[in-house]
């Protein structure tokens, strides 16, 4: 298999994490990390280094831990295997969510049950690439916004249903008048959801 000369990712901005397909690298391989990205180098199942934006040569002087695991028989130029993961650090504001089925809420004024749906959008930004890879992505080679929404769907739907029902009951808001309270309700929902997300 050929040794990769340049490693970079210029793909879809909806992709949060992307694993470079080849693991055949060399101490002369150029790693190009765009402004809104970080690149994480894995060797032997462990994180070796995290690279910020810029052009990096994967040489042992730049990555001291490589000295311990690769043999340098060719005058400091040696092939080695490692994984490179690109993490999108861009702030994404357009992640949509919604309840797949209506929430049955009892109207406090009339005593009847009214079906209510909730939907909206939220923003995400990966703050800690290492933690995100280890705790959420695992070994999935592509993790996009849709994967994130699927991962948290059960959690945020349950919390949203709970919070909306609680708001309506405690504030004695009729579901028929709910549109007049959307701003206040959105703030209440955001406060309850932030610790979970």
Segment roles from a protein language model:
Residues 1-197:
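N-terminal hydrophobic membrane-entry segments
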């Amino acid at each position: 298999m050929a040794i990769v000369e340049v490693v970079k990712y210029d793909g879809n901005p909806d992709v949060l994490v992307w694993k470079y397909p080849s693991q055949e690298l060399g101490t002369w391989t150029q790693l190009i990390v765009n402004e809104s990205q970080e690149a994480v180098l894995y060797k032997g199942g462990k994180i070796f280094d995290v690279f910020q934006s810029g052009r990096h040569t994967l040489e042992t002087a730049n990555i001291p831990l490589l000295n311990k695991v690769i043999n340098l028989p060719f005058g400091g130029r040696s092939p080695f295997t490692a994984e490179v993961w690109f993490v999108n650090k861009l702030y994404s504001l357009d992640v949509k969510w919604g309840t797949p089925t209506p929430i049955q809420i009892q109207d406090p004024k009339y005593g009847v049950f009214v079906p209510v749906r909730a939907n909206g959008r939220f923003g995400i930004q990966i703050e800690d690439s290492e933690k995100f890879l280890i705790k959420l992505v695992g070994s999935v080679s592509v993790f996009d916004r849709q994967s994130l929404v699927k991962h948290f769907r059960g959690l945020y739907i349950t919390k949203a249903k709970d919070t909306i029902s609680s708001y309506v009951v405690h504030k004695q808001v009729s579901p028929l008048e709910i549109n007049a309270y959307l701003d206040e309700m959105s703030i209440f929902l955001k406060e309850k959801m932030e610790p979970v997300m």
